[in-house]
Amino acid sequence: QELASFHSVSKGFMGECGFR
């Protein structure tokens, strides 16, 4: 369960970084 939360945050952070 915690892994999913971490994955979601990591994906959002990486996506935002790539978007900018």
Curated annotation (Swiss-Prot):
The modification N6-(pyridoxal phosphate)lysine is found at K11. It is an enzyme of class 2 (transferase). One of its GO terms (cellular component) is cytoplasm. It is found in: Cytoplasm. Glycation of Lys-11 inactivates the enzyme. Keywords: Aminotransferase, Cytoplasm, Glycation, Glycoprotein, Pyridoxal phosphate, Transferase. It catalyses: L-alanine + 2-oxoglutarate = pyruvate + L-glutamate. Its EC number is 2.6.1.2. GO terms for molecular function: L-alanine:2-oxoglutarate aminotransferase activity. Catalyzes the reversible transamination between alanine and 2-oxoglutarate to form pyruvate and glutamate. Participates in cellular nitrogen metabolism and also in liver gluconeogenesis starting with precursors transported from skeletal muscles. Belongs to the class-I pyridoxal-phosphate-dependent aminotransferase family. Alanine aminotransferase subfamily. Homodimer. This is Alanine aminotransferase 1. The gene is GPT.
